Amino acid sequence: MASLDVLIVGLGSTHGLRAAEDELAGSLLRAGADAMLVRAERPREVRTLALTDLMWARAARRAAVESLAEAAPRAVVYSTTTAALLWPQPGAVRFDAPAAGNRPGRHGVWQRPVERRRLREAPLLVPQDAGALVEAGSPTTESVIVPIPVEPSDGGAGGVRDIAALTYATNPYKKGLDRVLAAWEAVRREDEELVVAGLRGPDRPGVRYAGTLDHDDYRALLRRARVYVTAPRREDYGIAQLEALADGTRVVTTPAPGPYAALPLLAGVGAEDGAPVGWVADPSPAALGAAVRAALDDATDDAVYADRALAAIAPFRRAAVDRTVAEELLPRLLRP
């Protein structure tokens, strides 16, 4: 049986999750660990969230069992609490948001109690933000916070900003697309266009739907946008907002329940100069629209804003995350 330092059991159920899993594996490898990432095989589509989670948890268990039969890892990391629900052996749990927060009522009827047990039994928790621990009930299990690394995309800031505003709305209700559209209608000027990524819909004056895009194409749109706007009803992390900052795009948002790691940064909480790098407003059309208008009309030079935004996301950059993985996470995973 082959030896291995760290086995990561991932779900890979979304592009964002796959990217986060790849980043964790890469960071462990750069820290000198012999790490391997395996992913669950996508199950068939089912109708309810509770059954969907069961199917994914079973798929993650199968992937873990098969890999454990071939290797003897010193540590196992389950990527998401769903991957850990039916684990074949205890391991660290990596998560952005717990079922306690994003599976209310009947949607999480079986997941929440099992999750509480797993978070107690795990040797280590690896949340992506401190807010995820709070939403999980502040478990006493030892934890290391490891953010998702965010970097400027190829091309970075500095290009032509020929799109007034961009939003991402694969899940329209959760992302608050109705709020964004109402605010946009209230403040847009004749020559300004809002591009809606991740969704098909009927174009109308001032609004264009870009549909589903691969990540490179999406980031290319982001580099062209002056403002990224979102009004989520719940935000598990806020990776799109961090990517916007990484590419020098001004960000307008609303407060939202959930860990929402990007929100304090956008509001200027903890900033050395106390200055926010985003515009945070109430979700009403008047308030959100005013924030969108203020961001669009912001007189700060684009290059100056891009430099400020990059400085603000320094804790989320790959170099910072690599230090946390090498100095804090890996020693805890591999200790006797």
Residue ranges of model-derived segments:
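Active-site proximal beta-strand in glycosyltransferases
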Residues: 77, 82, 86-106
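Aromatic "clamp/platform" in nucleotide-sugar-dependent glycosyltransferases that forms part
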Residues: 233
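A charged, aromatic-enriched C-terminal amphipathic alpha-helix characteristic of glycosyltransferases
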Residues: 54, 58, 283, 287, ...
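Membrane-proximal helix-turn-helix segments that form the acceptor-binding/catalytic region
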Residues: 106-128
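Carbohydrate-associated surface elements
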Residues: 131, 149
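Short hydrophobic beta-strand element within catalytic cores of glycosyltransferases
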Residues: 250-254, 260
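Conserved donor-binding/catalytic core segment of Leloir-type glycosyltransferases
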Residues: 150, 156-175, 181-186, 194-195
